[in-house]
Amino acid sequence: MKLCVIAGARSAFLTKSLVKSTRDIRVDHIVLLDNDQQKLKTYGEISRELSRRLDPDLTFEVTSDARAALTGVDYIITTIRAGGDAGRLFDEQTCLAHGVLGQETTGAGGFAMAIRSVPTLVYYCTLAREVANPGHLIFNFTNPSGIITQALRSKGFDNVYG
């Protein structure tokens, strides 16, 4: 089975955990999809090397091509940060300037993050609906995960869990 991590070139720790679990979850192909070319190059190569060392039989790819990454996929994990670190910083500083908590999972900061993230994730979910294997599952870890998961399910993506 094929697994794609959207915004996957940002955490070698996630890659390590996934690669170590591939036999248990019956995954033989992992794709890290990311639109940040620098992170894709740096962390993607670290992740590729981790994969090679931990499970040389695993097919492992890094790419910025969403269509290729999602074609034939069975599982998708989302971990995007729409707006990047600059967006998070802006949200948190704006909230603090107005005397409210600005962290990304609750409150005004989380709501701002959701507003930026939902359209991007709708795009990926729509593309996956077109090119992924029937019955594919999407596991949302994009914060604020509850708000985003509910928004995607409200848009008809009943295969999203988070």
Question: Model-derived features: where do they sit?
Answer:
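N-terminal Rossmann-like dinucleotide-binding module
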Residues: 1-30
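Residues at the starts of beta-strands that form the adenosine-phosphate
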Residues: 2, 28-29, 59, 137, ...
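Gly/Ser/Thr-rich loops at beta-strand to alpha-helix junctions
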Residues: 7-13, 37-39, 140-148
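Short helix-capping segments at alpha-helix termini
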Residues: 23-25, 50-57, 131, 156
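Conserved acidic E/D residue at the C-terminus of a beta-strand in Rossmann-like folds
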Residues: 30-37
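Conserved N-terminal Rossmann-fold NAD(P) cofactor-binding segment
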Residues: 37-72, 79, 86-88
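Rossmann-fold NAD(P) dinucleotide-binding segment
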Residues: 68-134
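Rossmann-like dinucleotide-binding core of oxidoreductases
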Residues: 122-129, 134-162
